[in-house]
UniProtKB/Swiss-Prot annotation:
Keywords: Amino-acid biosynthesis, Cytoplasm, Histidine biosynthesis, Isomerase. This is 1-(5-phosphoribosyl)-5-[(5-phosphoribosylamino)methylideneamino] imidazole-4-carboxamide isomerase. Its main location: cytoplasm. PANTHER family: 1-(5-PHOSPHORIBOSYL)-5-[(5-PHOSPHORIBOSYLAMINO)METHYLIDENEAMINO] IMIDAZOLE-4-CARBOXAMIDE ISOMERASE.
Protein backbone atom coordinates (compact mmCIF):
# COMPACT_ATOMS: atom_id res chain seq x y z
CA UNK A 1 0.00 0.00 0.00
CA UNK A 2 1.59 3.22 -1.19
CA UNK A 3 0.95 6.51 0.57
CA UNK A 4 1.13 9.12 -2.18
CA UNK A 5 1.54 12.76 -1.11
CA UNK A 6 -0.52 15.26 -3.08
CA UNK A 7 1.02 18.50 -4.26
CA UNK A 8 -1.80 20.73 -5.46
CA UNK A 9 -0.60 23.65 -7.56
CA UNK A 10 -2.35 27.02 -7.69
CA UNK A 11 -0.65 30.14 -9.06
CA UNK A 12 2.72 28.37 -8.77
CA UNK A 13 2.25 27.61 -5.07
CA UNK A 14 1.50 24.40 -3.19
CA UNK A 15 -1.99 24.66 -1.67
CA UNK A 16 -4.84 22.56 -0.30
CA UNK A 17 -8.49 23.22 -1.09
CA UNK A 18 -11.53 22.33 0.96
CA UNK A 19 -13.93 20.25 -1.13
CA UNK A 20 -12.49 21.57 -4.38
CA UNK A 21 -13.34 25.21 -3.66
CA UNK A 22 -10.71 27.50 -5.24
CA UNK A 23 -11.77 30.26 -2.83
CA UNK A 24 -10.92 28.04 0.14
CA UNK A 25 -7.22 27.51 -0.57
CA UNK A 26 -4.57 27.26 2.14
CA UNK A 27 -1.03 27.96 0.88
CA UNK A 28 1.41 25.44 2.39
CA UNK A 29 4.48 26.35 0.36
CA UNK A 30 5.53 28.92 -2.21
CA UNK A 31 8.16 26.45 -3.47
CA UNK A 32 6.48 23.24 -4.72
CA UNK A 33 9.84 21.65 -5.65
CA UNK A 34 10.99 22.08 -2.06
CA UNK A 35 7.75 20.46 -0.90
CA UNK A 36 8.39 17.52 -3.24
CA UNK A 37 11.88 17.10 -1.72
CA UNK A 38 10.36 17.20 1.75
CA UNK A 39 7.92 14.35 1.03
CA UNK A 40 10.65 12.25 -0.61
CA UNK A 41 12.80 12.72 2.48
CA UNK A 42 9.80 11.58 4.54
CA UNK A 43 9.73 8.29 2.63
CA UNK A 44 7.34 8.96 -0.27
CA UNK A 45 7.84 6.53 -3.16
CA UNK A 46 5.44 8.25 -5.57
CA UNK A 47 4.03 11.78 -5.91
CA UNK A 48 0.63 13.05 -7.04
CA UNK A 49 0.48 16.50 -8.67
CA UNK A 50 -2.63 18.48 -9.52
CA UNK A 51 -2.68 21.63 -11.66
CA UNK A 52 -5.69 23.27 -10.02
CA UNK A 53 -5.70 26.33 -12.29
CA UNK A 54 -5.44 23.93 -15.23
CA UNK A 55 -8.39 21.86 -14.03
CA UNK A 56 -10.59 24.95 -14.10
CA UNK A 57 -9.08 26.50 -17.27
CA UNK A 58 -8.99 23.27 -19.28
CA UNK A 59 -5.32 23.71 -20.21
CA UNK A 60 -1.95 23.54 -18.37
CA UNK A 61 -1.34 26.52 -16.11
CA UNK A 62 1.46 25.44 -13.74
CA UNK A 63 4.00 23.87 -16.08
CA UNK A 64 7.06 25.69 -14.66
CA UNK A 65 6.24 24.36 -11.16
CA UNK A 66 5.71 20.85 -12.56
CA UNK A 67 9.10 20.94 -14.31
CA UNK A 68 10.80 22.20 -11.14
CA UNK A 69 9.27 19.32 -9.15
CA UNK A 70 10.39 16.76 -11.75
CA UNK A 71 13.93 18.15 -11.63
CA UNK A 72 13.94 17.92 -7.82
CA UNK A 73 12.67 14.32 -7.98
CA UNK A 74 15.34 13.34 -10.52
CA UNK A 75 18.08 14.87 -8.38
CA UNK A 76 16.80 13.12 -5.24
CA UNK A 77 16.58 9.74 -6.99
CA UNK A 78 20.08 10.09 -8.44
CA UNK A 79 21.57 11.14 -5.11
CA UNK A 80 19.95 8.21 -3.30
CA UNK A 81 20.54 5.53 -5.92
CA UNK A 82 16.83 5.10 -6.67
CA UNK A 83 16.05 4.03 -10.22
CA UNK A 84 12.71 5.82 -10.51
CA UNK A 85 10.26 7.72 -8.35
CA UNK A 86 7.00 7.86 -10.31
CA UNK A 87 5.24 11.21 -10.53
CA UNK A 88 1.66 11.50 -11.77
CA UNK A 89 -0.19 14.66 -12.79
CA UNK A 90 -3.77 15.65 -13.41
CA UNK A 91 -5.56 18.90 -14.16
CA UNK A 92 -6.37 20.54 -17.48
CA UNK A 93 -5.15 17.76 -19.75
CA UNK A 94 -7.43 17.75 -22.77
CA UNK A 95 -5.28 16.73 -25.78
CA UNK A 96 -2.64 14.21 -26.85
CA UNK A 97 0.01 16.88 -27.49
CA UNK A 98 -0.16 17.98 -23.85
CA UNK A 99 0.17 14.37 -22.68
CA UNK A 100 3.18 13.79 -24.91
CA UNK A 101 4.86 16.99 -23.73
CA UNK A 102 4.34 16.13 -20.06
CA UNK A 103 5.62 12.57 -20.52
CA UNK A 104 8.67 13.95 -22.34
CA UNK A 105 9.21 16.25 -19.33
CA UNK A 106 9.54 13.13 -17.18
CA UNK A 107 6.10 12.40 -15.76
CA UNK A 108 5.35 8.68 -15.33
CA UNK A 109 1.56 8.87 -15.45
CA UNK A 110 -1.02 11.32 -16.74
CA UNK A 111 -4.37 11.55 -14.97
CA UNK A 112 -7.40 12.30 -17.10
CA UNK A 113 -10.55 13.24 -15.23
CA UNK A 114 -13.21 15.54 -16.68
CA UNK A 115 -12.05 14.92 -20.26
CA UNK A 116 -12.51 11.15 -19.81
CA UNK A 117 -16.14 11.63 -18.80
CA UNK A 118 -17.01 14.31 -21.37
CA UNK A 119 -14.94 12.98 -24.26
CA UNK A 120 -14.41 9.21 -23.91
CA UNK A 121 -12.97 9.09 -27.43
CA UNK A 122 -10.05 11.23 -26.24
CA UNK A 123 -9.39 8.83 -23.37
CA UNK A 124 -9.53 5.87 -25.75
CA UNK A 125 -6.97 7.57 -28.04
CA UNK A 126 -4.74 8.45 -25.07
CA UNK A 127 -4.75 4.87 -23.74
CA UNK A 128 -3.86 3.60 -27.22
CA UNK A 129 -1.11 6.17 -27.79
CA UNK A 130 0.45 5.94 -24.31
CA UNK A 131 -0.25 2.44 -22.97
CA UNK A 132 0.35 1.93 -19.26
CA UNK A 133 0.72 5.66 -18.60
CA UNK A 134 -2.88 6.87 -18.43
CA UNK A 135 -4.75 6.93 -15.13
CA UNK A 136 -8.40 7.94 -14.91
CA UNK A 137 -9.40 10.17 -12.03
CA UNK A 138 -13.04 9.68 -11.06
CA UNK A 139 -14.45 12.14 -8.56
CA UNK A 140 -17.79 11.13 -7.10
CA UNK A 141 -20.44 12.20 -4.67
CA UNK A 142 -23.01 9.61 -3.55
CA UNK A 143 -21.85 7.24 -6.31
CA UNK A 144 -22.31 9.80 -9.12
CA UNK A 145 -19.37 11.18 -11.10
CA UNK A 146 -18.54 14.90 -10.86
CA UNK A 147 -16.67 16.92 -13.49
CA UNK A 148 -15.12 20.35 -14.08
CA UNK A 149 -13.18 20.65 -10.85
CA UNK A 150 -16.16 19.12 -9.03
CA UNK A 151 -18.43 21.99 -10.02
CA UNK A 152 -20.82 19.77 -12.02
CA UNK A 153 -22.47 16.49 -11.06
CA UNK A 154 -23.06 14.10 -13.95
CA UNK A 155 -25.67 11.37 -14.10
CA UNK A 156 -23.02 8.67 -14.56
CA UNK A 157 -22.55 5.88 -12.04
CA UNK A 158 -18.90 5.52 -10.96
CA UNK A 159 -18.71 1.75 -11.45
CA UNK A 160 -20.29 1.82 -14.93
CA UNK A 161 -17.80 4.43 -16.15
CA UNK A 162 -14.82 2.79 -14.47
CA UNK A 163 -15.55 -0.53 -16.19
CA UNK A 164 -15.83 1.21 -19.55
CA UNK A 165 -12.51 2.99 -19.03
CA UNK A 166 -10.86 -0.25 -17.92
CA UNK A 167 -11.85 -1.72 -21.29
CA UNK A 168 -10.11 1.23 -22.97
CA UNK A 169 -6.85 0.18 -21.32
CA UNK A 170 -6.29 2.74 -18.56
CA UNK A 171 -3.59 1.79 -16.03
CA UNK A 172 -5.58 2.41 -12.85
CA UNK A 173 -8.40 4.48 -11.36
CA UNK A 174 -8.02 7.20 -8.75
CA UNK A 175 -11.27 7.35 -6.84
CA UNK A 176 -12.01 10.51 -4.89
CA UNK A 177 -15.03 10.89 -2.65
CA UNK A 178 -15.55 14.64 -2.93
CA UNK A 179 -17.88 14.76 0.03
CA UNK A 180 -14.83 13.92 2.14
CA UNK A 181 -11.83 15.43 0.35
CA UNK A 182 -10.01 18.08 2.38
CA UNK A 183 -12.41 17.52 5.26
CA UNK A 184 -10.42 14.66 6.84
CA UNK A 185 -13.59 12.76 7.68
CA UNK A 186 -12.12 9.33 6.99
CA UNK A 187 -11.89 7.46 3.69
CA UNK A 188 -15.10 6.07 2.21
CA UNK A 189 -13.84 2.49 2.52
CA UNK A 190 -17.11 0.87 1.48
CA UNK A 191 -17.41 2.79 -1.81
CA UNK A 192 -13.70 2.32 -2.60
CA UNK A 193 -13.85 -1.44 -1.99
CA UNK A 194 -17.04 -1.75 -4.03
CA UNK A 195 -15.31 -0.07 -6.97
CA UNK A 196 -12.10 -2.11 -6.59
CA UNK A 197 -14.06 -5.38 -6.49
CA UNK A 198 -15.68 -4.56 -9.82
CA UNK A 199 -12.32 -3.93 -11.55
CA UNK A 200 -9.25 -5.94 -12.51
CA UNK A 201 -7.00 -2.84 -12.65
CA UNK A 202 -5.84 -1.20 -9.40
CA UNK A 203 -7.77 1.50 -7.57
CA UNK A 204 -6.02 4.34 -5.73
CA UNK A 205 -8.10 5.79 -2.90
CA UNK A 206 -8.33 9.51 -2.35
CA UNK A 207 -10.26 11.93 -0.19
CA UNK A 208 -10.72 12.02 3.54
CA UNK A 209 -7.57 10.44 5.00
CA UNK A 210 -7.25 11.81 8.53
CA UNK A 211 -4.95 9.60 10.57
CA UNK A 212 -3.18 6.25 10.87
CA UNK A 213 -6.50 4.46 11.49
CA UNK A 214 -7.62 5.34 7.95
CA UNK A 215 -4.38 3.90 6.57
CA UNK A 216 -4.81 0.72 8.62
CA UNK A 217 -8.42 0.39 7.46
CA UNK A 218 -7.30 0.61 3.81
CA UNK A 219 -4.49 -1.89 4.37
CA UNK A 220 -7.08 -4.32 5.73
CA UNK A 221 -8.92 -4.29 2.38
CA UNK A 222 -6.01 -3.70 -0.03
CA UNK A 223 -6.24 -7.25 -1.39
CA UNK A 224 -9.54 -6.23 -3.00
CA UNK A 225 -7.37 -4.28 -5.46
CA UNK A 226 -6.49 -1.03 -3.68
CA UNK A 227 -2.94 -0.06 -4.63
CA UNK A 228 -2.44 3.13 -2.68
CA UNK A 229 -3.95 6.20 -1.12
CA UNK A 230 -3.40 9.87 -1.90
CA UNK A 231 -2.73 11.97 1.19
CA UNK A 232 -3.31 15.69 1.29
CA UNK A 233 -4.41 17.89 4.17
CA UNK A 234 -3.64 15.21 6.79
CA UNK A 235 0.11 15.19 6.08
CA UNK A 236 0.24 18.97 5.68
CA UNK A 237 -1.55 19.65 8.94
CA UNK A 238 0.17 16.85 10.84
CA UNK A 239 -2.71 14.52 11.74
CA UNK A 240 -0.81 11.86 9.76
CA UNK A 241 2.96 11.40 9.82
CA UNK A 242 3.91 10.21 6.35
CA UNK A 243 7.04 8.25 7.28
CA UNK A 244 5.52 6.33 10.18
CA UNK A 245 2.29 5.74 8.23
CA UNK A 246 4.19 4.29 5.24
CA UNK A 247 6.25 2.14 7.61
CA UNK A 248 3.04 0.87 9.21
CA UNK A 249 1.47 0.20 5.80
CA UNK A 250 4.59 -1.75 4.75
CA UNK A 251 4.42 -3.75 7.97
CA UNK A 252 0.74 -4.61 7.43
CA UNK A 253 1.32 -5.40 3.75
CA UNK A 254 4.46 -7.43 4.34
CA UNK A 255 6.14 -5.15 1.80
CA UNK A 256 9.25 -3.00 2.03
CA UNK A 257 10.69 -0.46 -0.41
CA UNK A 258 12.71 -3.19 -2.16
CA UNK A 259 9.78 -5.49 -2.84
CA UNK A 260 7.63 -2.52 -3.84
CA UNK A 261 10.26 -1.53 -6.42
CA UNK A 262 10.53 -5.09 -7.70
CA UNK A 263 6.76 -5.34 -8.00
CA UNK A 264 6.76 -2.24 -10.19
CA UNK A 265 9.35 -3.56 -12.64
Amino acid sequence: MLLIPAIDLKDGHCVRLKQGDMDQATVFSEDPADMARHWLEQGARRLHLVDLNGAFAGKPKNEPAVKAILQAVREYAEKNGIEEIPVQLGGGIRDLDTIERYLDDGLSYIIIGTAAVKNPGFLHDACSAFPGQIIVGLDAKDGKVATDGWSKLSGHEVIDLAKKFEDYGCESIIYTDIGRDGMMGGVNIEATVKLAQSMTIPVIASGGVHNIKDVEALCAVQEEGIEGVICGRSIYEGTLDLRSAQDRADELSGVGPETEAEAGE
